């Protein structure tokens, strides 16, 4: 998917929060189309012309170095610049200043300007990484299923990864102990007298002996 289209999908979500238009592509320049990119006058700019435009306007709205490879450059227009400016102003303690400007000389840069440049560079890096993450295929390790089967939890799950034979033996022992507990409980309930104050539990399990005793 084209990085410019990915950018515009995110920008449209922000655009709907302050604009009540039903078709933003009619008046927002830079909207990608099948033929190219639309402009304010309704003209269509091809992808090659859009890359040239991005190279010309890159230094006006971002703090990227001029020698940055053009393969990762995204088309910059007024809406993208406004979005980045608003977000950077939100992070800055001085909300009245515009943080996106032409690059400053590090030798004459003040502390505030230096902080603003770091924020701008960090945002541009995050944007690049997010675009690469969306475009890149998922990692193979994220597609493999877990080796821990359903129902195995806690120490069984850990042992299942280390030694499946021991884990299966523990599971069988657990089922055996559970069966024995259930069997003892049933025997205790069956052998108990109807009323505890009438005597001790009868040793005989036959119903005829129980009736003769009472």
UniProtKB/Swiss-Prot annotation:
Composition-biased stretches (Basic residues): 174-189
Region of interest: Disordered: 131-214
Top-level taxon: Viruses
Protein name, entry field: Uncharacterized ORF3 protein
Low complexity bias locations: 197-214
